[in-house]
């Protein structure tokens, strides 16, 4: 698993201390190797061990999350409606303590993504995509792809506490460590957040009763497992039993997205329509991955569904399944530059990525589209450092192969 990124905020209360204003660099330095000898880092380590020591006897520290608008592209409709999403930043000391007791499990989930069905860590340009497509074909060739409306707002804390029981069973390292995890788990299911307006800004703390904080290290994994549990419960409600789920269904979930390879023998009972009805019983609005008003069939072939905004297409040249990103997402990637100070480097990198992603949509029209984009960037002098001519379709395929091998 990756180390803690040093270029992000260290959270509350560090943000209120000027000497700690340089994000996590204030603790770990900016050199290639982390600096653990600074006074700030030594104090941080002492705080981490105090958190663990108190959790051992059932004492919960006040770990406060700080909410801020997520810096991302949103559709015009969502932007006009003010539907900006929030990031909830976690305190650094808590993140370290949590990783000490949960990181091995998190790594195991990522390393077994398609095998377990929880696809955190999946590489759409690697063999994972073919594994999913082949499993759909093996099950009979029909599948369901779904999503939820306001998934985060309808979470069931009981499912998350049941997940903790499974995690402790996975570790099997004694009641003391299990108890520490149960105290640290409170910040996931009942997180505390900084609030207040006007003269009271930053002076109030309130606690969530449902939903998971987006900046928590385990939020994506926990949401994925809730998604999976709900799909199993719906199978029980529609088919009449639960124990055959893994025989007849191969689920793939990531957060609130899912794709289900369903055996033909249960397809009339467990499909898009019946899952939607069953989900309503648990307080969830389940839709297709398209999220629009478009009506989709109860089940579809793998070539007609999407997962994580990517489709499934068999590439004859590579003799493997590839994951074409939605065309509009491929084009929109060229519209924005996130950091004006690194504009030239970012535009070159974005163009390379565009070439790779566009190649997944086939040869037809590739040369015209890539040449058009290339000419615009050249006219802006963005690609002065790139002296090679516009790359042919075969280059996009070769770039894709290299990304697959590097993973």
Residues covered by each model-derived region:
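Viral RNA-dependent RNA polymerase
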Residues: 1-407
């Amino acid at each position: 698993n990756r180390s803690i990124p040093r270029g992000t905020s260290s959270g509350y209360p560090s943000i209120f201390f000027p000497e700690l204003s340089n994000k996590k660099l204030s603790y770990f330095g900016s050199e290639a190797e982390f600096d653990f000898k600074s006074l700030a880092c030594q104090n941080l380590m002492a705080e981490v061990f105090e958190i663990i020591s108190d959790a051992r006897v059932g004492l919960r520290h006040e770990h406060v999350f700080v909410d801020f608008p997520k810096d991302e592209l949103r559709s015009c409709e969502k932007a006009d409606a003010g539907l900006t999403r929030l990031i909830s930043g976690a305190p650094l000391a808590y993140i370290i303590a949590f990783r000490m007791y949960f990181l091995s499990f998190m790594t195991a989930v990522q390393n077994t993504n398609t095998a377990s069905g929880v696809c955190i860590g999946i590489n759409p340009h690697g063999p994972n995509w073919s594994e999913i497509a082949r499993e759909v074909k093996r099950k009979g060739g029909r599948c369901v792809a779904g999503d939820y409306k306001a998934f985060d707002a309808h979470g069931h804390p009981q499912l998350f506490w049941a997940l903790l029981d499974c995690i402790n069973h996975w570790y099997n390292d004694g009641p003391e460590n299990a108890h520490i995890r149960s105290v640290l788990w409170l910040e996931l299911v009942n997180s505390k957040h900084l609030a207040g307006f006007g003269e009271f800004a930053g002076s109030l703390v309130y606690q969530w009763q449902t939903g998971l904080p987006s900046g928590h290290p385990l939020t994506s994994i926990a949401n994925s497992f809730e998604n999976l549990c709900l799909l199993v419960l719906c199978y029980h409600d529609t088919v009449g039993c639960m124990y055959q789920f893994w025989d007849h269904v191969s689920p793939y979930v990531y957060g609130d997205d899912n794709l289900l390879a369903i055996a033909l023998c249960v397809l009339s009972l467990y499909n898009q329509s019946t899952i939607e009805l069953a989900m309503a019983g648990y307080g969830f609005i389940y839709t297709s991955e398209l999220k629009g008003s478009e009506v989709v069939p109860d089940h579809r072939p793998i070539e007609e569904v999407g997962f994580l905004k990517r489709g499934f297409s068999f590439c004859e040249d590579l003799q493997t399944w590839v994951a074409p990103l939605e065309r509009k997402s491929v084009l929109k990637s060229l519209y924005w530059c996130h950091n004006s100070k690194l504009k030239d480097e970012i535009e070159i990198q974005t163009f390379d990525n565009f070439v790779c992603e566009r190649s997944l949509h086939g040869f037809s029209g590739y040369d015209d589209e890539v040449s058009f984009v290339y000419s615009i960037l050249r006219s802006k002098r963005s690609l002065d450092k790139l002296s090679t001519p516009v790359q042919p379709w075969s280059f996009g395929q070769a770039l894709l192969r290299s990304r697959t091998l590097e993973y």
